[in-house]
Amino acid sequence: MSRVFITGSADGLGRAAAKLLIDEGHDVVLHARNRERAAAVADLVPRAAGVVIGDFSSATETMGVADQVNELGRMDAVIHNAGIFLEPSRGSTAEGHATTLAVNSLAPYMLTALIERPDRLVYLSSGMHHGGSGSIRDIDWTQRRWNASKAYSESKLHVTALALTLAREWPGVLSNAVDPGWVPTKMGGPAASDDLELGYLTQTWLAASSEAAATVSGGYWYHRQRQQPAREAADPAFQRKLIDRLAGLTGITLRT
């Protein structure tokens, strides 16, 4: 059985993935933004390996989450599931970053750099990453007029590129990105037409399955089928520029 940490596991895909893995006998560490949100997984807590608390719009709290996870011991897998969707404005974190960038891009990068290296990494992407910009000149939206859809697409391009970077730079780790589809969660809304179960089954499969098809690295997946990611996501030159930019924005270096 595996030890798995899942970010954003208080509801939606993260909660569904956590429940399935717990039901299968895995040791799952849950995450919630705050203690009030943690109440949403009160039914899972008695069977979980732990619960960590932290708001990913805060760099300080994100680092605190990494510390909490490391105190619990090494994980076999980490599922970077947490994210926010169409924010009405750029917002500004305590560090001055756009909220979408902080939660969807900077937090997964920071956690990856700070949490003891697991055997498997899974990053929640989106088909919308194909609409992301291959430029990192203004990824923090300090110069452009705010565009919620574009900002979200770019953030998902970032995590897809991060997953594929690590597949190359960390050969001992299986690193993959997953498009869960447009599923009927709080984020996706009731009109979403994709299959919720297939949305979370792919991430749990990549995180814990011993099937040969799941023990691969460098994939971009949709419903257990490998897909073609955006060109930039797989471009080593773009990947290097992105990682350097994320390191500069966070002050944290990703060790290779």
Tell where the protein language model's regions lie, with residue ranges.
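Conserved glycine-rich cofactor-binding loop
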Residues: 8-11
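N-terminal Rossmann-fold NAD(P) dinucleotide-binding loop
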Residues: 14-15
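Catalytic loop of short-chain dehydrogenase/reductase
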Residues: 83-89, 98, 120-172, 179-191
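Ankyrin-repeat alpha-helix packing hotspot
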Residues: 105-106
